[in-house]
C-alpha cells in the first residue's frame, strides 16, 4: 500500500498530540538538560513536554493570532512552522478572539485554535493575552484548559519565565461586544472588505475606548514575588527568556521595572506581542523583541506590519535569531499558502 506524504504527516501529528502532558520537577533547581517546570500536576499551560535531543536548543516564537484574526492565516502558519522542526513553539498571547460572555463561543474558539496547533507536532507554550482572558468566561476556559496564567520552565540549560500582563484581567465594556463580533463575522464572510474597513472601525469611540483599556499592563505583587523566587531558585542558567503579552517596557510599567531590576547581571531576552507591529530594541545590551502578527489584523502602516515568526537557536555566544515572514515560507511548490498574510 502506498503511503502519501499527507498520510504520513497526519499520523505523525496525531501521534505527537496524543502524548500525555507530564510536568517534571527539579529537586535541585539546577538547569540540566531535561525539561522541568514549577507547575504542579493538573492542567498545564502547554500541550506536551519537549523531548530531549542532542541538538542545540531551538524554538519558534509566534505573534498574535487575534484581534480580528484573518481566516486561515494562523492555521496555515502552524503547518509552515512544522517544517522548521523546532523543539517547541512559544506564543506571546492573543490566541483566541475572546471578548465574549458565552462559554460555548469561547470553547469553540479554543477548539478551533487547538486543531491548528495540533499541526505542529511539537509543544506549544501559551502566554495569556488580553483577548485570551478578559472576563469570567475566558478566565474559566484558560484555567480549565491551560492552568496557571504565569509559569516557568527550564530546558537545555535555559530558563523561561512566562508572565501575565492580565493579572488581574480588565473587562471590556459590554457595549463593545456586539460591534466587535460584527467585524469578526465580516472577516469570515468578506475578509478583503473587512480589512479595508478596519481603520474606520477601530476609530469608533466605543472600540477606541476598549482598545485603550486593553493596553493597560497589570502585573500583581504576587506575580513579582513569584518572579523573584523563581530567579533565586535558578541563579545560573545559560540564558533567561522572559515572555509576556504586552510590551511593558514601552509603558514604563513600575511592576515590570521591578522585574527588570531582578534580571540584572543575567544574560536575558524579553519577548512580547500585543502591538501587531514588529520592533527590536537593544536596552542595556539585552534584546527586547516586540512580535507583530500571526493572523491578527493590521493596526498601523509601516515596515513592522508583518505576519511572521522568529526562529531562535541557542549557540555558545547566546541566541541566534531569524525573522521569517509567513508569505516567505514556501513549500516545494513555491507556495506559502498565505493569500491574506501581510
PLM segments and residue spans:
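Extended active-site neighborhood of metal-dependent phosphoesterases/phosphodiesterases
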Residues: 29-51, 104-234, 239, 255-271, ...
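N-terminal active-site segment of His-dependent metallophosphoesterases
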Residues: 28-107, 222, 342
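Short, solvent-exposed loop/turn segments at secondary-structure junctions
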Residues: 69, 98-99, 134-135, 249-252
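N-terminal secretory signal peptides and thylakoid transit peptides that target proteins
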Residues: 1-16
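Short acidic, glycine-rich surface-loop motifs adjacent to enzyme active sites
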Residues: 96, 231-249
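Short, catalytically relevant binding-site loops at active-site mouths
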Residues: 167-169, 247-250, 277
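Active-site glycine-centered loops adjacent to acidic/histidine catalytic or metal-binding residues
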Residues: 64, 93-94, 129-130, 245, ...
Amino acid at each position: 500500500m502506498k503511503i502519501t506524504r499527507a498520510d504520513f504527516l497526519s499520523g505523525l501529528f496525531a501521534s505527537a498530540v496524543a502524548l500525555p502532558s507530564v510536568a517534571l520537577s527539579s529537586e535541585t533547581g539546577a538547569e540540566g538538560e531535561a525539561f522541568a517546570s514549577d507547575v504542579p500536576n493538573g492542567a498545564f499551560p502547554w500541550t506536551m513536554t519537549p523531548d530531549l535531543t542532542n541538538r542545540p536548543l531551538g524554538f519558534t516564537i509566534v505573534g498574535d493570532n487575534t484581534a480580528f484574526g484573518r481566516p486561515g492565516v494562523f492555521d496555515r502558519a502552524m503547518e509552515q512552522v512544522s517544517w522548521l522542526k523546532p523543539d517547541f513553539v512559544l506564543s506571546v498571547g492573543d490566541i483566541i478572539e475572546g471578548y465574549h460572555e458565552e462559554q460555548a463561543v469561547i470553547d469553540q474558539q479554543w477548539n478551533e485554535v487547538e486543531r491548528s496547533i495540533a499541526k505542529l507536532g511539537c509543544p506549544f507554550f501559551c502566554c495569556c493575552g488580553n483577548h485570551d482572558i478578559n472576563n469570567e468566561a475566558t478566565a474559566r476556559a484558560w484555567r480549565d484548559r491551560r492552568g496557571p496564567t504565569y509559569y516557568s520552565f527550564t530546558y537545555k540549560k535555559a530558563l523561561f519565565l512566562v508572565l501575565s500582563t492580565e493579572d488581574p484581567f480588565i473587562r471590556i465594556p459590554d457595549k463593545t461586544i456586539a460591534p466587535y463580533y460584527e467585524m469578526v463575522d465580516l472577516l469570515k464572510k468578506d475578509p478583503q472588505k473587512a480589512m479595508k474597513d478596519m481603520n474606520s472601525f477601530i476609530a469608533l469611540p466605543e472600540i477606541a475606548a476598549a482598545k485603550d483599556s486593553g493596553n493597560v499592563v497589570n502585573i500583581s505583587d504576587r506575580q513579582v514575588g513569584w518572579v523573584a523566587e523563581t530567579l533565586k531558585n535558578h541563579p545560573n542558567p545559560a540564558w533567561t527568556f522572559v515572555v509576556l503579552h504586552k510590551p511593558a517596557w514601552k509603558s514604563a510599567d513600575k511592576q515590570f521595572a521591578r522585574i527588570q531590576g531582578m534580571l540584572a547581571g543575567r544574560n536575558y531576552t524579553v519577548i512580547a506581542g500585543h502591538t501587531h507591529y514588529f520592533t527590536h530594541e537593544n536596552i542595556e545590551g539585552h534584546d527586547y523583541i516586540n512580535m507583530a502578527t500571526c493572523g491578527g489584523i493590521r493596526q498601523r502602516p509601516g515596515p513592522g506590519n508583518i505576519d511572521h515568526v522568529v526562529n531562535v537557536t541557542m549557540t555558545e555566544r547566546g541566541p541566534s535569531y531569524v525573522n521569517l515572514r509567513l508569505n516567505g515560507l514556501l513549500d516545494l511548490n513555491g507556495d506559502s499558502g498565505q493569500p491574506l498574510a501581510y
